[in-house]
C-alpha cells in the first residue's frame, strides 16, 4: 500500500513553484483535496486556482488551515520556503510534513518510473519521453520542470502505471526516487554549493545510477563518468545509439539514426 493513500488533504507550502505545482496537480487529478500557500500570485498560481485548487498569499493561519485534520493531511514543502508561520503551525500541531522530493519519491515507488537526470537537458528530454508515452497511449503521469509547449502544462495525467519524472540533482533530491529506467544527459560540475567539487557531484550521479535495477536499463550520454553497465548515446560519435549527418532544411532537422549496425533516416521539426 502506498503510504500516501491514507491522506485525503495535501497542503503545499510554496505551491507556486514549478516542481510543487506539478505535485499539487497530481493529487488534485487523483481526487484529493489540495490547497496551499505562496508568497506571490503568478500566472501559474492563477491556473491552479482555475483548476479548483485553493491558494492563499498571506502567511497566516486562515480558517482553511485551522480546519485541517492532522490525521488525514500531509503537508508538503520546499526548502526554498523558510520561516513561515504556516509551517510553524503545522509543526506545533503534529501534522506530517515532508519535502517535495520525498513525496515524489513515494509516488515513484508504486509506478514503473522513467527518470531523467543530468545537469542540463532534463526538461526537454522528459517532455519528449512524455510525448512518446502519450502518443503510445500508455497509462502514465509526467512531472516536468517547465511548461511543455504541447501539453501547455508541467503535468499530464493519463494513469498511474508509469511515471516520467525529472531527477533533480540539487540537494541530492534524485536519491529519493525509485527509478526503473533512467537517462543521464550530463554530469557536469554544477550546484557546487551543495556538492563542493566536480568529483562529489559525479559520485552523486553514480549513486543515482546505482538505484536502477540490474534487469532494467540506464541510458547515458557518451563520455559521462559512470561505473556500471549502461547504454550510451551520442551525436557524430559511435555509441549504442547515435545520430550523424545532421542538417536543417526548410525548418526541419534531418539526420541518420544508428543502432546495432542499422541506419534509419529521420526528420522532425523540433530544433
Locate the predicted segments by residue.
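Positively charged, low-complexity intrinsically disordered leader regions
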Residues: 1-7
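Structural motif
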Residues: 9, 73-74, 181
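Conserved N-terminal Rossmann-fold NAD(P)-binding element of oxidoreductases
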Residues: 10-15
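N-terminal Rossmann-fold NAD(P) dinucleotide-binding loop
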Residues: 20
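NAD(P)-binding Rossmann-fold cofactor-contacting core
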Residues: 31-47, 140
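Conserved SAM-binding strand-loop segment of SAM-dependent methyltransferases
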Residues: 54-58
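A short glycine-threonine-serine/GTX helix/turn-capping micro-motif
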Residues: 172, 265-271
